[in-house]
Structures are given as C-alpha cells and as structure tokens.
Amino acid sequence: MGCAYGRAVPYEGEVSPQGRPGVPGTRLLAESAALKQFSRRGFLAGTGAAGLLAADMLLTRQVQAQRRTDRILPVADDFADAYYPDASWFLFPGYKTSWEEAQWILNSLRGALNKRARLAAVGYSNQGLDIDSIVIAVIEYVRAQKLTKLFFYGHSFGGMVATQVAARLLEIHGVEVQFIVLDSSPYSKHDVLDQSWFDGVVFLYERGFRFPSTLRGGYELGERVIHKDERSWRQILDQTLEQLSPIAPSSLLIQSESAYIYYFDGSRFAGKLGGAKMAYIGNPRDRTVRYQTAVEAWAVAFKANMVSSSLHTEGARPAHASPGWNPNVYRPVLDQLLDEHFPLPRGGSRVTVF
C-alpha cells in the first residue's frame, strides 16, 4: 500500500537499527564495540603488512643497486681465514648463476677448498658481463687483502671467464694465478649442445632486444622440463621461480653471458697464463656441454698448463657443473687434485700459524 507523498513503505531490512522498535540498548552497544574492535584489528594488520612490504621493497632496491657493479663476495671460513690470510679462491659462477648460488657453491665445497686458501666468489654486474670490470674488481680485492696466491674455480662457462681474467691479470698487473679448475666448462660455442636458443639469444642481444620477464619465465620452465630426468618437479619449480626473483641475474646479464660464450676464443689466451696449473673435471653424461670435445679442446690448447683432464664427477645429478647439489661427489675429486698438485706441508698433525 502506498503512502503520502508517493513514498513506499520501506522493507524491514531497510530500517536502521536505531529506528527499529524493540531493539534493546545493550545490543546497540555490543554492535558498536564489535565494530570498533574489528576496525582496530584490521587497521593494525593492514599497517603491519604495509610495513613488511615497504621493508622488503627497500631491501630489494638496495640489493639491486649493489648489483650494478662487479663485486668480490668473501665467504667467511674461520680455518682458512686464520691459516691462509694471503691466499684465496675465486669462484667464477656459471651461466645464470646468482650471487647467492655462487656463495652456496663455495659453502658446499669448503671442506676441500679451505685447506689451501680463503673463499670468495665473483658477483657479476646486472648491467652485463664486462671482463675489464671483473679484472679491476679482482685486482682491487687482491691488493686490499694483500693476497699473494690466487686459486680460480671456473663453474661451467665461468671457466672461460676465469681463464681470460687470469691472462689479463698477468699481462696488465703481473699477478700470476696458481691454479684454475675448469668444472664442465665449454671451450667454445660448439661444445654447447642446445644451439637453437643460444643463437637466438645472441642475435636479439646484439640488436638491442631485452627479454621481458614473462618470456624469460616460459623459457626457464621449458628448459628445465626438457631435462626433467635430471631434476625433481620440485627442483624444476624452485629453480624457475629463483630465476624470476627480483635479485636473480638480470636478463641483460644473461644475454651478455650468451654473447660471451658465442664469441669466446680460448686460443687467444694459450701461452699467456705463465706457470698457472689447470685441471678439467666433468661428466661424460653431461647433457648441457659436450664433454668429450670440450675436455679435448682445453687439453690441446693449454697443453703447457693442463695437469689433469681425466677426473670425472660420476654420480652427480644433474651431470653438468653441479657441485652445490653434489658436494659428496665433488669434494673427493678436488681433494685428489689439490693433494697431488698442491700438497700440504708434512710436519705432523699440528700446524703452527706464524
């Protein structure tokens, strides 16, 4: 039924609580108190979440800013720091290997490496791979730490970088590297088994194209699925997400690494390493680098420096350059190499630090 002035009678649900007959005052007070409590709780939760997000964004920005330049990343080791203050390992990370993963690899291998020297990793700049800049970072660290003995570990393509840096250090600064370990390192682009994507990355990089995260994410997932027999599905997902993290190697760095591999010519550095010793370790089951051609090429080109090229990382999974995942496979191999070519002083079980 209508009412005066053309207004319809409101439904019960449209009447405010204050206008409802029979609503006790205690109920109104309870509803008000509940609303007040909810608002305070929601406000505090929202403020806390916003604070955490802001802190995370600030930390991420700081980390990204730090990675605009090449840096040497020391890994603390009480034993090595005390007994070998003048010697250091430098780990040159492989393709798409982050700063965190490089340090993780050193931590995995510390039981073998810390018997000869301290530990440090080379963090590549997210602005792109620049050998001159890496050489500067290394020599500045050498001088600051007063190092006289340098040991290089080339992880996958990092073996190429380690070799060139060693040659440049001797040529420009007169600093000779003691030992270079090549872990599953390709000698040239021809040793890389998957040429299709490799060529495309270099082609686009040289024309100034930079991969967006969405395209890169699809590739990262696809690449690992292809080699799913070497990883669990959990590892596939974790490694793909790591590559899409804000602190992962940038697309620019990855593309420049691809171009470096594509044009690398190891013969340019043969005969330019002085008395440095070299050793190649790898796995015949490697499905990323063609092991047989790579090890033979390195052994021939650096015949004067190569002291070992027959030790295998049998049982490692993935088979290609995986010391972080397989320290129990890698440490005995490194122990054998170092004991043979850099034997520790024999003088009993106690060593005195002077």
Language model regions located:
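N-terminal secretory signal peptides
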Residues: 1-38
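N-terminal export leaders
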Residues: 38-52
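Short, surface-exposed "cap/lid" segments of acyl-processing enzymes
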Residues: 65-113
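Conserved alpha/beta-hydrolase
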Residues: 110-127
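Gly/Ala-rich beta-loop-alpha elbow adjacent to hydrolase catalytic centers
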Residues: 154-162
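Active-site nucleophile loop of the alpha/beta-hydrolase fold
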Residues: 181-191
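Serine-hydrolase catalytic core
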Residues: 227-307
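Catalytic active-site module of serine/aspartate enzymes centered on a nucleophile-bearing elbow/loop
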Residues: 310-354
